[in-house]
Design a protein with these regions (language model features):
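Short glycine/serine/threonine-rich phosphate/pyrophosphate-binding segments
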Residues: 1, 74-85, 107-108, 171-179
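Phosphate-binding loop/pocket of nucleotide- and phosphate-handling active sites
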Residues: 122, 177-200
Length: 200
């Protein structure tokens, strides 16, 4: 409808391969007059937007509800995670940051063991999980991590639409799955916020 050319990329190659989606996007931008590669994985404006906008909005809305204790999110480009962590460090330092990470992503092993694997697994949930560490990422801010498999993520997304009328994708289901697992470990009365990265 807008006249753009859609370029499909391979999912079986890693960063550094010319057909990896980010490498190919950078090449297309470099080869196309007037094009610009936004590079959300390395662009400091990505986390800055969440620090300046998303974080204060959550704090303001949750103040009206009596506050909150944790925030659960998935990590793709890391903009949400890094930006919120900066905002909360200044304005709500008591809030725990909880990452919901799909099976196959390298982030769980890196956070839990300090081991950065050069081989990721595969997962079906789109938009979250990593096979590399984005340069815009500050992974040190994560207080807890919960694995969220494909099946449970998609089931939670379906339950979200059936029960709440919110049309959201698998990454939102992962966030719900991670939040449920995290909350089961906590004493009653703790209040989490869960980021659903969909327009639903």
């Amino acid at each position: 409808a807008m006249g753009a050319e859609v370029v499909l990329t391979r999912s079986d190659v890693g960063k550094g391969h010319p057909e990896y989606y980010q490498d190919l996007a950078a090449k297309i931008a470099a080869d196309t007059p007037g094009a610009y590669f936004i590079n959300q994985f390395g662009n400091p404006d990505n986390p800055a937007a969440h620090q300046a906008s998303t974080g204060p909005e959550i704090i303001e809305q949750m103040a009206e509800a009596g506050g909150f204790d944790a925030i659960v999110f998935g990590c793709g480009s890391s903009g949400t995670m890094t930006g919120l962590s900066r905002c909360f460090a200044e304005h709500a330092p008591q809030v725990e940051l909880v990452l919901a990470d799909p099976g196959g992503s390298i982030l769980t092993q890196y956070i839990n063991e300090g081991v950065l694997s050069d081989k990721s697994g595969s997962w079906l949930v789109e938009g979250i999980g990593e096979d590399f560490l984005p340069s815009a990422m500050d992974i040190t801010v994560v207080d807890a991590i919960e694995r969220a498999g494909d099946r449970e993520s998609f089931l939670w997304a379906r339950q979200l639409v059936r029960q709440e009328g919110i049309f959201a994708g698998g990454s939102s289901g992962s966030a719900i799955a991670g939040a449920i697992k995290y909350c089961r470990k906590l004493p009653a009365g703790r209040i989490p916020v869960v980021i659903l990265p969909d327009s639903g």
